[in-house]
Amino acid sequence: HHETTWLMLNQVLKHVKPGMSVLDLGAGSGILSITANKLGAEKVDAVEFDSDCESNFNENLQLNHIEKNIHYYNDDVLTWEDFNYNIILANINCNIIEELIPKFKGTKANVILSGLLKTDYKTIEQICIKQNFQVKEKMIKGEWICIVL
């Protein structure tokens, strides 16, 4: 797996508890959504813009014998407006994350972000500070970082 997937999976394992609700922005093949479901998340909403990912996502649900509690939305993450979840995941590129952070204002969720290079950190940190978010955790693997707000 890519380093960012590894970083995100570690945070999913650490933060997702039974009964929680999870939003997976940029869900791709569904690995993070599926893991959250397996950990007992009651509701997982997976949002992915790339329509080519949907069949792969659904195939992975079948392979993992998942029939409920995950909903797939072929949608642009930047138009998503509901952030009322326990956990928000976004393993997506830096430019999208820069636009997403202000949208998270007011959420009580743990927000877990990756797809960020170490060189992106200062920029992302400044955006977080401007939006009154505190970086609670920062993990590094190779050239990549994952942060928890």
Model regions and ranges:
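Conserved SAM/SAH cofactor-binding pocket of Class I
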Residues: 2-77
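S-adenosylmethionine
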Residues: 10, 49-148
